[in-house]
Structure formats: structure tokens, C-alpha cells
């Protein structure tokens, strides 16, 4: 049985400037949502979707969230492009149909959809933090389902698979999803592993998903795109550090969890189709779309800076002077290699990286102090979370994006 429900505006707080494309997309998708008794609502979960200036992927992601068999009780849309000046709330009802013979009328369950601005966020996780700080998220919420606007659930059971895994692995501190390309056929990663002072994937980026990695569970790191993050984890590990940026904050957060005695679990049955718009050059650093007829933007510098931040904070601070001197030698070698490959921009990036690292030492000092304070074991004491021998290693894409 299907029917249509019109969302009810419950917060008259948006001014004329807030009547934006993003509001129109949300309202249209809610108005056009086919109502189904096959859906249920879990009020313990709040989904947070961060949205950039580029809206090409958002409607597909929001629609995929609305199709979930288990809906989050709260769906937060965090706009990072100054289109939402004040919070706005919409609601819609779901009447789940229990299995078996129905003897009583099922009770309505309400889903809140909240639009908020996150204009000054410096990373994905910072936008999520800013969004949920602007309203009362509710005492019943126990976890956040974090999504980029270009990371859509690849099927209707994505959140359900996450919740089942959380129920069966209650000690998991963070649960991540299998990362696929936007069509949902090629793999990006299925969790990541520690390898010296970096993290690597044991997946060849783009290889067909044939469920060959679906036996994985405990890993060293997962992408935050599509991750289920318990609020207790955020509190226990002092939140996610935005200093690492969108390309690096997931690596640091997962590292602190693993070294602090927590568990990072990948749920291969939960599938996220991730366009990785900024990494793939489809989106500029400021969130604007790259024109279809223009060359893709090169994300090389942002990715390398994230890798460098991770490397510095992964060693004792007394090693930093030697690491910096070594980075100069490495920059010369990598710069020459990039020039030989006719990549002058990347060569310039490599040559400037040692100097770009210096202003960030204060942030690195704080990050390293947090790791030492929270850490209980070393990465070497976690052999099952280490990468295999070199022939089996494949460097994955940027974690958290």
C-alpha cells in the first residue's frame, strides 16, 4: 500500500535569503516520497548530510536516505554554502507494519528533517559538529550516520546493515561502510590498514565488487563517509580533529580509537556509493563545481598535506627535526619524478611541502599530545590491523573522502 504524505513545517525560522535551491530540493523530495509500510524508524540514529555549493549529487543522496528500510529518526542537512541562515525543521510520519497478523493499529513514528547552516566549517566532521550544536538533537539519539552530499547509500538496506552490525558488535567504537564508486560497481576500499606511518588499502581502486572482501571486520581505519559514529565514541575520544582536514581527519580519529583500545569495524554489507567529487577533481576546494568542459581540479596538494600531517603526528616529537630534513630530500626526489612524468604542478607541490608543514606545527603538537594521552598500545601491538607484505599492498584513496 502506498500513499503520499506532505511534510509539515514546524519551525518558521527561515527568512527570504534562506529560500534556496537546497530548501527546494528537500521539500520536493519529501513531498514526492512514496509512503511505504515496509519502512520503520530508529530514533536512536541521526543522519547528518553535509552539502557544498555544488548540488549535483545531493538530490540522489537525500533520496537514497529517504528510501532506507530503517529510517533515522532525525535527518540533518548541514549547508556549507551560506544558503541557510537559520534552522528550519520539517517532519513526516511513518506507520510501520509489524510482521504477522496485525491486531492493533500500528503507531505513527515521526522523522524530523532539519536544515542548518555550517558556513565556517573547515572539514567534513567540523560541519557535522557545527550542525548538531545548533539544536537539541534529542536524548534518544545514540549515534550519527555521517554522509557527504556525494556519498549515497547504494541500496535500501545500508543503515539497516549498519545497525545490525552495531547490535551484533556492541563493543565497536566506530562502524564504517564499504566504499564504492558512484555507479556502485567498482570498489574504493573496504576498510584500511596501518603501514608504518601511513594507512593503506588492500583493495585495488576501481576493481569490480564481487564480495571478495566481505569477510573483513576489524580494521585500522574506515572512511567517515557513511560511517555510524556513536556519540559515546565522540565523547570518549575527544571528538574528530578538524586540523587534519577532510582528507585526513578520519585517519587520525580511527588511529586514536585503535591505539586507545577501541574497535574500528567495517561493515561490507553496508554499501556507500561515493563520487569523491573533490578528490576526483569534479569539485573545487571551496565546494564549487568544476565546469563540465574544464580540466578536473588536481587534489594532489590537499592529499599530500593530509598524508604529511598523519606522518608527523605518528612519531615522537623529538623526531620531527630529522623528519623535516628528510622531507626536503624526499621532496627533491619526488619533484624530479613528477617533472619526468610531465606533472609540473605536482612537482611544485612536492617542493613546497616541507615549507608548508612549518606553520602547521602548532596543530601537529596538539594532535600528537592527544594521541599520547589517549593511546594505550602501539600500532605494532595490533598485528591484525597491519598491512600485509609489500607485494599485497595497494595504496588506497584519501580516507574520509
Q: Model features per residue range: what roles?
A:
Residues 2-66:
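N-proximal low-complexity "stem/linker" segments adjacent to membrane-targeting elements
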Residues 207-229, 290-292:
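A recurrent flexible, glycine/aromatic-enriched loop bordering the glycosyltransferase active site
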Residues 118-137:
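Glycine-rich, basic loop-to-helix element that forms the pyrophosphate-binding segment
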Residues 220-238, 243-271:
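A short, conserved alpha-helix in the catalytic core of glycosyltransferases
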Residues 152-194:
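Conserved donor NDP-sugar-binding/catalytic core segment of glycosyltransferases
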Residues 140-152:
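Short beta-strand-to-loop acidic/aromatic patch adjacent to the donor-nucleotide binding site
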Residues 259-362:
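Active-site-adjacent helix/loop segment of glycosyltransferases
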Residues 66-117, 136:
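Acidic donor-binding segment of Leloir-type glycosyltransferases
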Amino acid at each position: 500500500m502506498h500513499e503520499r504524505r506532505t511534510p509539515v513545517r514546524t519551525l518558521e525560522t527561515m527568512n527570504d535569503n534562506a529560500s534556496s535551491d537546497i530548501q527546494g530540493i528537500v521539500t520536493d523530495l519529501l513531498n514526492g516520497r512514496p509512503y511505504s509500510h515496509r519502512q520503520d524508524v530508529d530514533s536512536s540514529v541521526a543522519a547528518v548530510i553535509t552539502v557544498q555549493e555544488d548540488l549535483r549529487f545531493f538530490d540522489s543522496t537525500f533520496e537514497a536516505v529517504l528510501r532506507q528500510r530503517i529510517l533515522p529518526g532525525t535527518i540533518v542537512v548541514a549547508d556549507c554554502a551560506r544558503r541557510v541562515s537559520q534552522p528550519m525543521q520539517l517532519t513526516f510520519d511513518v506507520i510501520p507494519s509489524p510482521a504477522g497478523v496485525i491486531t492493533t493499529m500500528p503507531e505513527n513514528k515521526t522523522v524530523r528533517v532539519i536544515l542548518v547552516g555550517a558556513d565556517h566549517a573547515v572539514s567534513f566532521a567540523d560541519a557535522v559538529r557545527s550542525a548538531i550544536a545548533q539544536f537539541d538533537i534529542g536524548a534518544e539519539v545514540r549515534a550519527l550516520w555521517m554522509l557527504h552530499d556525494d556519498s549515497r547509500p547504494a541500496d535500501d538496506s545500508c543503515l539497516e546493515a549498519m545497525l545490525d552490525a552495531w547490535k551484533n558488535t556492541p563493543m565497536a567504537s566506530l562502524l564504517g561502510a564499504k566504499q564504492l564508486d558512484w555507479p556502485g560497481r567498482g570498489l574504493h576500499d573496504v576498510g584500511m590498514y596501518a603501514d608504518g606511518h601511513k594507512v593503506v588499502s588492500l583493495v585495488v581502486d576501481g576493481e569490480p565488487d564481487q564480495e571478495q572482501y566481505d569477510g573483513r571486520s576489524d580494521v585500522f581505519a574506515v572512511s567517515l563517509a557513511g560511517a555510524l559514529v556513536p556519540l559515546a565514541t565522540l565523547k570518549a575520544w575527544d571528538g574528530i580533529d578538524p586540523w587534519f582536514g577532510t582528507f585526513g581527519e578520519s585517519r587520525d580519529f580511527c588511529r586514536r580509537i585503535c591505539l586507545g583500545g577501541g574497535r574500528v569495524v567495517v561493515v561490507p554489507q553496508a554499501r556507500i556509493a561515493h563520487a569523491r567529487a573533490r578528490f576526483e577533481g569534479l569539485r573545487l576546494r571551496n565546494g564549487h563545481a568544476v565546469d563540465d568542459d574544464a580540466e578536473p581540479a588536481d587534489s594532489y596538494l590537499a592529499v599530500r598535506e593530509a598524508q604529511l600531517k598523519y606522518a608527523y603526528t605518528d612519531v615522537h616529537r623529538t623526531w620531527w627535526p630529522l623528519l623535516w630534513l628528510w622531507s626536503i630530500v624526499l621532496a627533491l626526489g619526488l619533484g624530479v619524478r613528477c617533472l619526468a612524468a610531465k606533472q609540473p604542478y605536482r612537482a611544485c607541490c612536492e617542493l613546497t611541502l616541507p615549507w608548508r608543514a612549518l606553520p602547521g606545527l602548532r596543530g601537529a603538537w596538539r594532535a600528537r599530545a592527544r594521541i599520547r594521552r589517549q593511546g594505550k598500545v602501539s600500532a605494532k601491538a595490533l598485528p591484525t590491523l597491519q598491512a600485509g607484505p609489500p607485494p599485497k599492498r595497494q595504496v588506497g584513496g584519501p580516507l574520509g573522502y
